[in-house]
Amino acid sequence: NSKDIDPLIKAAKKNKVIIKEAFMVRHHPQWQWIKKFIKSGNIGKITNISSVFSYNNKDPKNIRNIQKYGGGAIYDIGCYPTVISRYLLDKEPKKLVASNFKDKNFKTDVLSSVLMDFGGIYSSFTVATQSNKSQQVFILGTKKSIVIENPFNAEPKKSTNIVIYNGNSIYRKDNTIKTFPPIDQYEVQVTAFSDHLLKKTKVD
């Protein structure tokens, strides 16, 4: 929780160093493009963001399944749909409701669903650790909608696609595909932070 971060912040201030949370997704060009696209007004007003992120891991020795080490779906991957919603909307949620199902042996959540209220804009997500491997984000606007095929774990050696549905048909016949070339979002993240330290550039 936020209290766990306080000692790190104090240490950084004391030693006059810079720290940054390592959310690599914010540095992938697809998300930066989407944020600009939303700000342009092309999608209209965002009404909902829906995300799914899941994998299947039942190894009792894996840190993701050990409660005392912060295991479970919410702690492991729930942060990604949360941070993307905050990044795109430039807002903090006013309230949220959540429900989860826990493994009877691990005592960690293996299936969790969350609904966040950003004040007239909803963001909902489901994360799971004992389900089919899957990831997707759907952004619903009053004019158009967007589907991000590989929103969180983008393969560094393969291109990524986002699909923009123009809203002229409920059957999604009228769409545009935006393709981004292969890129390692972790490398981009490290480069951005290094440039911030060495060249005083702005880091988002």
Label every PLM stretch briefly.
Residues 82-156, 187-202:
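Contiguous beta-strand/loop segments that form the cofactor/metal-binding neighborhood of enzyme cores
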Residues 137, 155-171:
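Short polybasic amphipathic segments
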Residues 1-26, 41:
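Beta-strand-loop-alpha-helix segment that lines the small-molecule cofactor/substrate pocket
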